[in-house]
From Swiss-Prot:
Residues 45-104 form a coiled coil. GO terms for cellular component: chromatin; cytosol; linear element; nucleus. It comes from Schizosaccharomyces pombe (strain 972 / ATCC 24843) (Fission yeast). The keyword Nucleus applies. Keywords: Chromosome, Chromosome partition, Coiled coil, Cytoplasm, Meiosis, Nucleus. During meiotic DNA recombination, binds to and activates DNA double-strand break (DSB) hotspot sites. GO terms for biological process: chromosome segregation; meiotic DNA double-strand break formation involved in reciprocal meiotic recombination; reciprocal meiotic recombination. Disruption phenotype: Abnormal linear element formation. Strongly decreases DNA double-strand break formation during the meiotic cell cycle. Abnormal sporulation. The gene is rec27. Component of linear elements (LinEs), which are similar to synaptonemal complexes, at least composed of rec27, rec25, rec10 and mug20. GO terms for molecular function: chromatin DNA binding. It comes from the Eukaryota. The lineage of its organism: Eukaryota, Fungi, Dikarya, Ascomycota, Taphrinomycotina. It is found in: Cytoplasm; Nucleus; Chromosome. This is Linear element protein rec27.
Length: 125
């Protein structure tokens, strides 16, 4: 306190000195508050940046999973289409075989109907 009174001058009253000391204390208090505010703001910004990075990473992982899912589904669709074509080809093949067998049976039936009952047919063994 003595130093302050020396710096302020010996002609100042104690109330002026007290006022000056209070102003300095107030300034120090303000400086501490500003420093604390800056610290909180810095932590907040750091947390925001960390959350942003984590969010971007999560979004990237989700996008990757979506791409993998799309590729998987495209492969499944391709496989199903190939199976469908194979089944359709087999169906057509069976239709042709059935039609040929029916024609053979129809021809045999026609021969049986035209042949008298007591004559052997070339289909009998």
């Amino acid at each position: 306190m003595k130093k302050r009174s020396e710096t302020l001058g010996s002609d100042q009253s104690s109330s002026e000195i007290i006022e000056h000391v209070l102003e300095e204390l107030n300034l120090k208090n303000i400086e501490r508050r500003v420093k604390k505010y800056d610290q909180i703001e810095s932590e907040y910004k750091t947390n925001i940046e960390n959350e942003k990075k984590a969010f971007i990473k999560d979004v990237s992982q989700v996008q990757q999973k979506i791409k993998e899912f799309e590729i998987q589904k495209a492969n499944q669709i391709k496989q199903l289409n190939e199976e469908k074509l194979s089944i359709e080809a087999r169906k057509q093949q069976l239709e042709i075989e059935i039609r040929n067998q029916l024609l053979q049976y129809a021809e045999k039936l026609r021969i049986v109907v035209k042949t008298p009952m007591n004559q052997p047919t070339n289909t009998e063994v």
